[in-house]
Amino acid sequence: MSSGIHVALVTGGNKGIGLAIVRDLCRLFSGDVVLTARDVTRGQAAVQQLQAEGLSPRFHQLDIDDLQSIRALRDFLRKEYGGLDVLVNNAGIAFKVADPTPFHIQAEVTMKTNFFGTRDVCTELLPLIKPQGRVVNVSSIMSVRALKSCSPELQQKFRSETITEEELVGLMNKFVEDTKKGVHQKEGWPSSAYGVTKIGVTVLSRIHARKLSEQRKGDKILLNACCPGWVRTDMAGPKATKSPEEGAETPVYLALLPPDAEGPHGQFVSEKRVEQW
């Protein structure tokens, strides 16, 4: 076990913003960088691409929808490094605007990965985070827009400083159920499934940061959600304003906050600035 070596890990690291984050961490992080991807072939191809640039990330398979896959990664990190220093939860999906898939199916599929998959990764890997560790959950400005489109009752719940993880899970499940019944708008939900899943990611980040402050107060772990901006990726398309490299800036900034930093913690960060939630 090479537990003296620091290690950073990025989910969904084989393309787009994830790949740009891995590239930056390989250059700036003093330790090993693990690129994870659902598809082994694509993940290893991304590693080879970075190796051709003179960088040396490691690869490990990870499908955030598969608990066994998450646990295999957890065991690898524990055995190889005795824990984890930096976790960047970047993996996520979105349907294209013109996608003909029925809305309730889009809601269920997007929620499964973006919220529940990310939550499962946190459940398994947060206990491994070492003192002065950094956790970055890549959310979206769409979460802020979706929040503003929620009913006042839902907004109040999502902004609550005391909402529990169980309550948040209940709300995320309710959204999916409401879409199946065709009553989501009547129930105060916005019509962006992606936006609601990212509300989930942002609020989950606030909850986990609060728990870390309560349960591991002296460990100086900082956990935040962030928006990378509108980035030219397979997800956002070619018209977006930022390159993947520019999209990686805020996540990497949060991943590399100096050891003595007091914050940000439990915040939603965009363009390296704390945004009001």
Curated annotation (Swiss-Prot):
Glutathione binds at residues 95-97, 106, 193-194. Expressed in kidney (at protein level). Inhibited by quercetin, rutenin and its derivatives. Pfam families: adh_short. Gene3D superfamilies: NAD(P)-binding Rossmann-like Domain. Its EC number is 1.1.1.184, 1.1.1.196, 1.1.1.197, 1.1.1.71. The keyword Cytoplasm applies. The modification N6-1-carboxyethyl lysine is found at residue 239. Transmembrane segments: none annotated. InterPro entries: CBR1-like, NAD(P)-bd_dom_sf, Sc_DH/Rdtase_CS, SDR_fam. The modification N-acetylserine is found at residue 2. CDD domains: carb_red_PTCR-like_SDR_c (cd05324). GO terms for molecular function: 15-hydroxyprostaglandin dehydrogenase (NADP+) activity; 15-hydroxyprostaglandin-D dehydrogenase (NADP+) activity; carbonyl reductase (NADPH) activity; oxidoreductase activity, acting on NAD(P)H, quinone or similar compound as acceptor; oxidoreductase activity, acting on the CH-OH group of donors, NAD or NADP as acceptor; prostaglandin E2 9-reductase activity; S-nitrosoglutathione reductase (NADPH) activity. GO terms for cellular component: cytosol; extracellular exosome; extracellular vesicle. The keyword DNA repair does not apply. It comes from the Eukaryota. The active site is at 194 (proton acceptor). NADP(+) binds at residues 10-34, 63-64, 90, 194-198, 231-233. GO terms for biological process: epithelial cell differentiation; glucocorticoid metabolic process; positive regulation of reactive oxygen species metabolic process; prostanoid biosynthetic process; vitamin K metabolic process; xenobiotic metabolic process. It catalyses: a secondary alcohol + NADP(+) = a ketone + NADPH + H(+); a primary alcohol + NADP(+) = an aldehyde + NADPH + H(+); prostaglandin F2alpha + NADP(+) = prostaglandin E2 + NADPH + H(+); prostaglandin E1 + NADP(+) = 15-oxoprostaglandin E1 + NADPH + H(+). The modification Phosphoserine is found at residues 2, 30. It is an enzyme of class 1 (oxidoreductase). Belongs to the short-chain dehydrogenases/reductases (SDR) family. NADPH-dependent reductase with broad substrate specificity. Catalyzes the reduction of a wide variety of carbonyl compounds including quinones, prostaglandins, menadione, plus various xenobiotics. Catalyzes the reduction of the antitumor anthracyclines doxorubicin and daunorubicin to the cardiotoxic compounds doxorubicinol and daunorubicinol. Can convert prostaglandin E to prostaglandin F2-alpha. Can bind glutathione, which explains its higher affinity for glutathione-conjugated substrates. Catalyzes the reduction of S-nitrosoglutathione. This is Carbonyl reductase [NADPH] 1. It comes from Homo sapiens (Human). The gene is CBR1.
